[in-house]
């Protein structure tokens, strides 16, 4: 992510946290709560997209390093069972 996107991500995340706090307080009129919910959903969607993009970039980088991450969050060959599974698949 670029510095500009990092800053926007942080701002959107901070705003989302503010919105969640306001909604959890329960002290808002219905209309205000609905507006905040919609704004929060937009912030959450943006943050999720940026996180997905960053994860994809890391996966591409790791593939280039011949050390891809598995879905369990560890690298191939990190655990002894990995080598046995790879041999069975071959």
From Swiss-Prot:
<keyword id="KW-0378">Hydrolase</keyword>
<comment type="function">
    <text>Bidirectionally degrades single-stranded DNA into large acid-insoluble oligonucleotides, which are then degraded further into small acid-soluble oligonucleotides.</text>
</comment>
<dbReference type="InterPro" id="IPR003761">
    <property type="entry name" value="Exonuc_VII_S"/>
</dbReference>
<comment type="subunit">
    <text>Heterooligomer composed of large and small subunits.</text>
</comment>
<keyword id="KW-0963">Cytoplasm</keyword>
<dbReference type="GO" id="GO:0006308">
    <property type="term" value="P:DNA catabolic process"/>
</dbReference>
<protein>
    <recommendedName>
        <fullName>Exodeoxyribonuclease 7 small subunit</fullName>
        <ecNumber>3.1.11.6</ecNumber>
    </recommendedName>
</protein>
<comment type="similarity">
    <text>Belongs to the XseB family.</text>
</comment>
<dbReference type="Pfam" id="PF02609">
    <property type="entry name" value="Exonuc_VII_S"/>
</dbReference>
<feature type="compositionally biased region" description="Polar residues">
    <location>
        <begin position="64"/>
        <end position="74"/>
    </location>
</feature>
<feature type="compositionally biased region" description="Acidic residues">
    <location>
        <begin position="79"/>
        <end position="90"/>
    </location>
</feature>
<keyword id="KW-0269">Exonuclease</keyword>
<dbReference type="GO" id="GO:0009318">
    <property type="term" value="C:exodeoxyribonuclease VII complex"/>
</dbReference>
<dbReference type="GO" id="GO:0008855">
    <property type="term" value="F:exodeoxyribonuclease VII activity"/>
</dbReference>
<feature type="region of interest" description="Disordered">
    <location>
        <begin position="62"/>
        <end position="90"/>
    </location>
</feature>
<dbReference type="GO" id="GO:0005829">
    <property type="term" value="C:cytosol"/>
</dbReference>
<keyword id="KW-0540">Nuclease</keyword>
<dbReference type="InterPro" id="IPR037004">
    <property type="entry name" value="Exonuc_VII_ssu_sf"/>
</dbReference>
């Amino acid at each position: 992510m670029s510095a500009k996107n990092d800053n926007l991500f942080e701002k959107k995340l901070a705003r989302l946290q503010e919105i969640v706090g306001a909604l959890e307080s329960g002290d808002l009129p219905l209309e205000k709560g609905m507006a905040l919910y919609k704004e929060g959903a937009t912030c959450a969607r943006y943050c999720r997209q940026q996180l997905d993009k960053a994860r994809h970039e890391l996966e591409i980088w790791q593939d280039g390093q011949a050390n891809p991450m598995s879905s369990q969050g560890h690298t191939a060959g990190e655990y002894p069972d990995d080598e046995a599974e790879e041999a069975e698949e071959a």
